Amino acid sequence: MKDKKIKVFYAVQVSNFTFVDGKPKWLLRNDACTNIAIGIISTILKRYPDQFKFLVKLPAAFDTIDVLHLEDLFKPEFHKDIEFLIDDIPHSPVTSRYHFDMQRYLNDPQYLKTFEDVDVMINDENTLTKNWRVLFNEWKLSIPIISTNYFLDSPIANKVPERIRYYERQMESFIASDIAAFQCEAGRVEAMEAYDILFKSRDILAPQSVWGVGAHYAEIEEYHTDKKFEIPTIYFGNRISDTANRYTNYDTFAEAIGILSTITDKPFRAVMLNPTRKATPEQLELINTLSKHQVEVMSNSEKFTRADYLTFINKSHIACNLFVTEVHGGVTHCEAMMAKNILVMPRVNNYLHKMLKAGHADYPYFTKIDQDQPHKPDARDVAMKIKEALDSIGTLKETEIRELCHDIGYKHESYESACDRIVNDIHTLVFPILNHKN
């Protein structure tokens, strides 16, 4: 290891925002990519003390509703090795993915000075990989780029309208990067299938790496408790969103709870966490109708801190994560597993892949896909699996499944398990450059 610390520039893809008095504000503590970045950075700094420092690109704290100082996102022990690059990005998961102010960086010499000692970049904004590459080239800086790929938009699994899709930019990032990093193997496979639609050859691709990152186990472990809610609690932690044919399938959860209410006599509480705090009256009416008024939706104005969330999931019994077209399955399912929830999920993609790797293809709470709507789980089967999970509460089976989810979640989705793989990728890119300079 060289004497000076390796400096990592980490550009975070921020997409979670809400409205306050009609004006948009970022929700960093509930943002998936922000929490992934916090977890990766914290884990690396803890495991490799005095070897790394980070320059983290985020919007300003005053442009959020849940952060007073960006430093507060990290534990005090890490503050000395973290600095921030403030970026005034549009409040939108779409327009922010295309925003890049090249002139800003070129006109102010302070930016060049900031980047001169950067050794490597981790880029969550994979639609902007080529932009960063061009900027570094203009500055005559040899900064290798690891582009992460957490949210694929492609003809296989479209997320936004075709004319503004991220697809071509994301495919370009596989070429413009030095390493293309994927959250899970299922995501890598889907990305390569999408790439083959656009390009004839894979020879120009950057090397690929599967990190296996989903959640920060140390953070979740702090809130572990054996004391569960008195009433068995089932929750849906993903967005209430109509994007991409309701790709989070919040409506399926509501429908399943409505069915559940007719087939069980056991008490239960069903909650939708509404993390973006943007549920519309129309969405709430749909949820009420489908669920037969059996689902509580956290209100847009209800305060729910990161600590509140971690306390809630650790005291809950059953988590439903119902992604079909988003292959990783969402950060919330990883957090649910590590919190020892019984996880109800479709038998597809990363949900299935990690269970297969762990030797549990027969996981009892996998759900079927709707035969008429292949992008959605079957609501009746979801209801049946929730009922079976409810029936298991207080039995040996509940304990066994909770421990199984916990152990598989840690092994296949924790930053702690992924840390050495990530650091190895950084070393692979940085050491040859440092050796050449020396």
Where does each model-flagged region fall?
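N-terminal subdomain of nucleotide-sugar transferases
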Residues: 1-68, 116, 262
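Conserved donor-binding/catalytic core segment of Leloir-type glycosyltransferases
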Residues: 6-12, 181, 225-248, 254-258, ...
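Active-site proximal beta-strand in glycosyltransferases
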Residues: 9, 120-125, 134-161, 181
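Acidic donor-binding loop of glycosyltransferase active sites
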Residues: 117-120, 311-328
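A short, active-site helix/loop in glycosyltransferases that binds the activated sugar's phosphate group
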Residues: 164, 168-205
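Nucleotide-activated donor-binding/catalytic signature segment of Leloir-type glycosyltransferases, i.e.
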Residues: 281-307
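Short hydrophobic beta-strand element within catalytic cores of glycosyltransferases
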Residues: 342-346
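A charged, aromatic-enriched C-terminal amphipathic alpha-helix characteristic of glycosyltransferases
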Residues: 373-377, 394-431
